[in-house]
Amino acid sequence: MIMDYEAILNDIKPTSDEKRHIDDVSSDIMNFLQNACNSRGIDAKVTLVGSVAKNTALKGKSDIDIFIAFPLETKKEYLKEKGLELAHLCCREFDVDAEHHFASHPYVTTHIEGCEVDIVPCYAIKNGSELKSAVDRTILHTRYVKQNLTESQEDEVLLLKRFMAMTGTYGSEFKVGGFAGYLCELLIIYYGNFEET
């Protein structure tokens, strides 16, 4: 049986309108947060990470992950305090509620213009040896994938994610215990395409 990958991609690839909306919302949030950092004298850089940044998000699953990267010498308490302060400022600006979560340190999840948004403080590391918390590596992961995944391979990642979702093996959450999106991207970078993976 021959698979019609184009038909599958039409079902799982975000439309140009969806991509444009996600890009616009992401830009608005990032600009607000970076301006808030600058106007308050907070030394931090706002960065888009995750599948939206890597162009590997499935249709309807375009969660926006925005990291606020603080210098390595920043004290952890300051990072937590200012990270949450900036996230709450953003929620007030967009008139939305903030949900608190905890990974290596607190972060905020909210919904802005129909998009789920995570605002996460982290440390700006240049390599894995500087890792201070688990979330710090996310920026490095995003950078690696963007540098190594070709445009045509982005579709291959979508096919792999969909296949894994259909078999119940996609999702790194505890209840699923499956493959993370980052692992799907690494597999496509290594093997080249969905069929070889």
How does the language model describe each region?
Residues 1-61, 72-78, 108, 122-124:
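N-terminal regions immediately upstream of nucleotidyltransferase
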Residues 5-10, 62-65, 136-137, 160-164:
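Short amphipathic alpha-helical segments, especially helix-boundary/capping motifs
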Residues 28-41, 85-94, 163:
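Generic non-transmembrane alpha-helical segments
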Residues 48-49, 56-138:
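Well-ordered mid-protein domain cores that form the structural environment of catalytic cofactors
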Residues 103-197:
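Catalytic cores of NTP-dependent nucleotidyl/adenyl transfer enzymes across multiple folds
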